[in-house]
Amino acid sequence: MLESSELAKLVAGRWDATLEMTLRSHPAGGELATYKFAFDLTITDRDRANIYFPASDNITPLVNLNVAYLPVPSPPHVEGGTSLDMCLYDGLGSQIPYLEVTIRDDGKDAPGRAPGMHSVWHHAGGRGDDSRLDYSITLDYGGVPLKMDNNVTQRLLGIDTTQLRLVVLPGMSQPVYCVPAPLKLTVPRVLASSKLAGYYEGRMIIEMVVPSSTP
């Protein structure tokens, strides 16, 4: 019988073990027979599939694009960028062939915006080009940068063979493996005179889909 305290140590993934039993006529006697039992278990934890941000633990991260005003070289311009550490937990011990990831902004109309770009908006609420700062996103998957166009799904192949990261997720006591997927956000250089001075804000929405055909 497996005690509940031992069961609690099993995290999502594939587990295997071998039990060997030897039959003797008495403790000091020779072996009469040997029995071997192979165990192969797949533990799933779909309800805890999670997009995890290690630096923010269990809170929604607040991302600063670090946009700076640069007077030189002339004419003055603004640009910026930042990185966001992210790890994807599939609830299956990363035993699946792929994950699908989609990143989008809050979907406001942005006429004239370059294809694939995401946006933040001036706090005053304007909708013109001068009230919008655009940025691009790339996702590093196994050392390969993948461009994450706005509301376009990227399929991350080879989840079951890629390098994994051991983390303790919020609400869990045992470490699990997740897929490192850090993001790089880049605000390209634009003329400072083309944008309103002040505070810009917006939302970045990240969605992860786990294939339904897995165990």
Language model features by range: what are they?
Residues 2-138, 182-215:
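N-terminal small/polar-rich segments of proteins
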Residues 138-196:
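C-terminal structured domain segments
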